[in-house]
Amino acid sequence: ELVKRGAGVITSITTRIRKGRKNQATLYFKSWDDINFQIQNALLFFPDEGTDNKLLNNFDIRRKNDRNYLKKAYQTLIKDFPDKKAQIRPEILLIKYALLGFDKCKDLVNADENIIRFKSREFDKHKAYTSDPNIAFYLKDVCIDVFGKSLDPNLEIADCQGADSTDPA
């Protein structure tokens, strides 16, 4: 399996598969601004309970205080919704993945889009990023170049799926 993920709720990533001279996976990470914007939008759906709006307008997951606020918001949200509903609400999942993936991805995300490549023997390492929803949240796009005679060089297959699939088969 080239992609190793299913249709996602939050972590849907556009993956392009095309013919290449060798197997190579290129992962495009979101910028910090993109990540913080997504989290701010998710937080807009919840009551502020007297929260300082300055924090919400200037949220940055890199700051420990902001992550602590996000953890509190997440804990409140999972208490407010029955178990099964908490697991399918996109805003709650987004916050969960952002928090759980932060430590793994903080050095891979930059002010601008960051790109990492896995070539040849390292090719399959991309699956660890695309199959884990906590990491996949931080991905913007994936491009997979596959060596093969049967692939037309003018053909590109696009797939939009995610690691948090309800049916990863």
Regions flagged by a language model, labelled:
Residues 1-169:
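Globular "head" domains of long coiled-coil molecular machines
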